[in-house]
C-alpha cells in the first residue's frame, strides 16, 4: 500500500533520516538547555535590582545573546564552517550541524529563561533573602522551581525551532529529513519523497509539543 502511493520513498533512507533529525535535535537541545539556563540566569541575576546587579557584565552577556540570536541560521552555518571543520573534522553529516545548532539555539533559549525568571514573584525572592538564604539556595530552591513550567514551555519552543533548523542544515549536507526532502525529493523531482519527509517533520513537531504541554501541565501547580 505504501509503495503504491509513495513509489520513490526508500523506507530505510526515511528511517535513517528520521534518526539523524532526532539525533541532531536532541544533542543540540541538551547543550542549548545547559548553556541557555546558565546565560539566562546570568542575564537575570546581573540585571538592575537583582541579586548580582552588574551593568557591565549584563551588557556584555546581553550583547552576545542578541548577536547570535539575530543571525539567520543559514548564514550562521556558513560563518561557522571553519570552526565546525576544526571541531568535528568535517562540514558534512549530522555532527557537523551540531555547533551551529547549539550556538543558534542557546541564546534563543537564554532569553526565554530570563523571561521565565522575571515572572517569579519578587515577594517570594525577598522572603527567602530575609530568611538569610544564600544566593545558591535562592537560585535552586526558589527561582528554578518557581519558573519550571515556563522553562519547560521554553525548551519545547526551542526544540520545535531546532527541528526547523535541522531541516535547513540538512538541505546543505548535514543529513536528516531536510536533506532527504531536498536531495531525494526536490532535486530528484520526487514530490512524494518531499511530502513524506514533511509529514514526518510535522509528526515530530506535534509529538514534542504534546510532550512539552503534558510535562508543563503536570508541574504547573498554579
Swiss-Prot record:
Claim: Transmembrane helix is one of the keywords in the record: yes
PROSITE patterns xref list: ABC_TM1 (PS50928)
A Pfam short name: BPD_transp_1
Cellular component annotations (GO), alphabetically ordered: plasma membrane
Superkingdom of origin organism: Bacteria
Keywords: Amino-acid transport, Cell membrane, Membrane, Transmembrane, Transmembrane helix, Transport
Induction (UniProt): Repressed by methionine via the S-box system.
Residues annotated as transmembrane: 25-45, 73-93, 97-117, 152-172, 195-215
Domain ABC transmembrane type-1: 18-212
GO biological process: D-methionine transmembrane transport
Quaternary structure and partners: The complex is composed of two ATP-binding proteins (MetN), two transmembrane proteins (MetP) and a solute-binding protein (MetQ).
UniProt xrefs under PANTHER family: ABC TRANSPORTER PERMEASE, D-METHIONINE TRANSPORT SYSTEM PERMEASE PROTEIN METI-RELATED
Assigned protein family: Belongs to the binding-protein-dependent transport system permease family. CysTW subfamily.
Described function: Part of the ABC transporter complex MetNPQ involved in methionine import. Responsible for the translocation of the substrate across the membrane. It has also been shown to be involved in methionine sulfoxide transport.
Name of the protein: Methionine import system permease protein MetP
Species, as recorded: Bacillus subtilis (strain 168)
Record gene name: metP
Amino acid at each position: 500500500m505504501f509503495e503504491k502511493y509513495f513509489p520513490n520513498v526508500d523506507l530505510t533512507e526515511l528511517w535513517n533520516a528520521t534518526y539523524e533529525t532526532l539525533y541532531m535535535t536532541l544533542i543540540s537541545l541538551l547543550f542549548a538547555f545547559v548553556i541557555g539556563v546558565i546565560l539566562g540566569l546570568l542575564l537575570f541575576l546581573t540585571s538592575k535590582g537583582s541579586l548580582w546587579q552588574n551593568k557591565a557584565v549584563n551588557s556584555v552577556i546581553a550583547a552576545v545573546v542578541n548577536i547570535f540570536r539575530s543571525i539567520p541560521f543559514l548564514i550562521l552555518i556558513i560563518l561557522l564552517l571553519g570552526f565546525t571543520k576544526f571541531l568535528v573534522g568535517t562540514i558534512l553529516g549530522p555532527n557537523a550541524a551540531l555547533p551551529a545548532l547549539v550556538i543558534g539555539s542557546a541564546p534563543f533559549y537564554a532569553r526565554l529563561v530570563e523571561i521565565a525568571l522575571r515572572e517569579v514573584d519578587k515577594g517570594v525572592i525577598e522572603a527567602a533573602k530575609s530568611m538569610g538564604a544564600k544566593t545558591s539556595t535562592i537560585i535552586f530552591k526558589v527561582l528554578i522551581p518557581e519558573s519550571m513550567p515556563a522553562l519547560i514551555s521554553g525548551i519545547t519552543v526551542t526544540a520545535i525551532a531546532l527541528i526547523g533548523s535541522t531541516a535547513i542544515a540538512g538541505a546543505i549536507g548535514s543529513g536528516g529529513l531536510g536533506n532527504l526532502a531536498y536531495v531525494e525529493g526536490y532535486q530528484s523531482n520526487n514530490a512524494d519523497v518531499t511530502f513524506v519527509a514533511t509529514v514526518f517533520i510535522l509528526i515530530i513537531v506535534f509529538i514534542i509539543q504534546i510532550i512539552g504541554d503534558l510535562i508543563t501541565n503536570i508541574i504547573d501547580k498554579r
